[in-house]
């Protein structure tokens, strides 16, 4: 315990030293608001109503019943059907960033609360230091995997978590968990970190977690988009894509979740679009690095389950995203598992997570291409027998700017779903 306290004490010292240093002058969104349109017709609303007025729009989320879009206020006021749901964007942005008061509070609670890491959102350097600390704290359970480098030269890190060496049980099923594919979805990053910490911290003291790590392998990537995530801290809290160059010099970034090489489509949008898929499959460096890694290690990991964390809208999405005409294999069991995940969350926190086909969520049934090249479809079709995307809290009051006091509640409810998922993979008859 002394060794553990020493490690965490050093981590806190570094954390307090660097927190705030990575925060830059944020993009000003005082002239923008988020509008909710009660329409399920994406094509009519965006292509026929909004696009003729401006190309400065950003679709935050879409569902069967509504579409949330960030617009300049002067444009939003010209569209009668929209209801303002977020008007104070700069204030909400600041509320997601750590403060000096928070740092003082963390120093005070450290001795009695190792969960202090989850009191606030954390920048990329801090998260990477924390992953390295976990490897040192749990050397028999954790190995940091280096998947490759991003366009800006940052490492793409994963944690391999297992209670015993793969050669002792070569048939162990592997669960892959990813977060932060879209840079601004900070709650997805914190939620993945919460899950991996619970698995490690409870090993040996909880029968369930001990069984999970002894009988399953986990590959966990908390920040799938390191460049974009770092940029949300230093420049623009609402940045979505990665940061690589495109064929249009003034337009940086590819949407990683449109870059995977299953049912990929060449971009129909301008390179400046938030959903720009690039000019070739796997053009996004992060998607390419992951593809190369899982091919090189396919003899080491038998990937059986995949959970991709996103925000927002409180939904559990199942394949396929690219088309509503393509039926997934084993649909009945896939739906049963989806509703089981939703029930586990509801039992834990009372929150309702709707179960929806990813194609409906993406709007692929209305405008083909919106769900092309997704990580969900790629992993489901090529690697994982079971694959889901979880869109976390909330349902629109804060959108991507969920206050940090939600980190632990979201972590707890989502971890309940992960435990259900693990139980299912170990015993499909539950």
Curated annotation (Swiss-Prot):
GO terms for molecular function: zinc ion binding. Residues 25-105 form a propeptide. Binds 1 zinc ion per subunit. Residues 1-24 form the signal peptide. Residues 120-425 form the Peptidase M14 domain. GO terms for biological process: cell wall organization; proteolysis. Zn(2+) binds at residues 182, 185, 310. The keyword Metal-binding applies. InterPro entries: Peptidase_M14 (IPR000834). Disruption phenotype: Growth rate is increased in lithium chloride. Calcofluor White sensitivity is background dependent. Glycans are attached at residues 41, 295. Pfam families: Peptidase_M14. Transmembrane segments: none annotated. It comes from the Eukaryota. Its cofactor is Zn(2+). Disulfide bonds join 251-272. Substrate binds at residues 182-185, 240, 257-258, 311-312. GO terms for cellular component: extracellular space; fungal-type vacuole. The keyword Transcription does not apply. It is found in: Vacuole; Secreted. Keywords: Cell wall biogenesis/degradation, Disulfide bond, Glycoprotein, Metal-binding, Secreted, Signal, Vacuole, Zinc. PANTHER family: INACTIVE METALLOCARBOXYPEPTIDASE ECM14, PROTEASE FAMILY M14 CARBOXYPEPTIDASE A,B. Belongs to the peptidase M14 family. This is Inactive metallocarboxypeptidase ECM14.
